[in-house]
Amino acid sequence: GRPPLELGGVLYCDRETVDKIEKMKVCTCLNPLHTAMSIYGCMLGYNLISAEMADEDLRSFIQKIGYIEAMPVVVDPGVLNPYEFIGAVINRRLPNPFMPDAPQRIATDTSQKLAIRFGETIKAYEARGLDKSNLVLIPLVLAGYARYLKGIDDNGQPFEISPDPLLAELQAIVNPLEVKEGEQDFSCLKALYSRCLLYTSPSPRDA
């Protein structure tokens, strides 16, 4: 026999369901929101995710990424409701000041995370024939990553970029770009997103 862990809220399910739960979390309901907040949190001078959640613009940003852009292609595991899950993430987990998570920590190895956290949603839109022009904020996250790689915050001051195995390579790619300049040659972004996403459409420049 086994202990009645279900009385404490534990869910028993098969491996396929576990995989679906993981995809729901990693591709839609948690990890993409974390990455979006980490990129912009570093550039805006935040040191805590919970503090970012007090910024109505950032809160609205991740709500729209999750509910409007990613949720149409969410993997539904059946045993958990994706809408209830993301609601708990946005309203309880992320604003919790007793969970002292830092955008700088979450931004570690971002180059290794973009493909699964955002690229899968883009590919799912294409696979289902959905209108990719509805993707506005996910491309904005990717555009923000190019800006993040410059290591200059919103006040024009340098900040320390989190460790990443591709950091030197990616910084070399965006080196021709200047922060807060006008018209520039953005062709280097194709190489950046091809390297991080193994996927090149839609262009984050369109954000």
For each predicted feature, which ranges?
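Long mid-to-C-terminal assembly/interaction modules of large eukaryotic proteins
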Residues: 141, 145-146, 156-158, 162, ...
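Conserved phosphate-binding loops in nucleotide/dinucleotide-binding enzymes
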Residues: 17-25
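Solvent-exposed loop/linker segments at secondary-structure transitions
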Residues: 19, 36, 46
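Conserved small/polar residues in nucleotide/adenosyl-binding loops
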Residues: 199-206
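C-terminal catalytic subdomain
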Residues: 40-162
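Primary mode marks residue(s) on the alpha4-beta5-alpha5 output face of response regulator receiver
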Residues: 1-16
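Conserved phosphate/anionic-ligand binding catalytic regions in large, soluble enzymes, centered on
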Residues: 26-41
